[in-house]
Regions:
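GST-like domain detector, emphasizing the conserved glutathione-binding G-site
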Residues: 1-117, 123-125
Length: 126
């Protein structure tokens, strides 16, 4: 989702293909053997198969609002928190049957403490 959003924001035209993950096309596996999405095949033979890579590449093509002109360390920390511990908590909240020993309200509270409160503090400072 975030790779697609960055491409759209940057005005980069791409051929979008929906992939059924249970039935990955051979053409996709040839360019990206690990078989995960997203995959962006560039004309020069370069293949990007991480959403964050695709985001940075797209913003490198066109960044009309200067999103990349930020404190890189702070931005990286937010992405790492989102992709690591927050994603874990999100999965625990979304799929409670996979985590029967966890209480959803406790997971939600941890997620709020991890992401929402720090975002509010950051926004209040700006």
């Amino acid at each position: 989702m975030r790779a697609r959003m960055a491409l759209k924001y940057a005005g980069v035209e791409v051929e979008h293909r929906e992939i059924e993950l249970r039935n990955k096309p051979q053409s996709m596996l040839l360019v990206s053997p690990k078989g995960t999405v997203p995959v962006l095949c560039l004309g020069d033979g370069l293949v990007l198969d991480q959403s964050l890579e695709i985001m940075y590449w797209a913003l490198g093509q066109c960044d009309p609002d200067g999103w990349t002109l930020v404190d890189e360390v702070n931005a990286h920390d937010w992405v790492e928190t989102n992709d690591g511990p927050f994603k874990t908590l999100l999965d625990q909240y979304k799929y409670p049957n996979r985590y029967p020993d966890l209480q959803q309200q406790e997971v939600l509270a941890k997620a709020i403490d991890l992401m929402l409160y720090p975002i509010e503090v950051s926004l209040q400072k700006s």
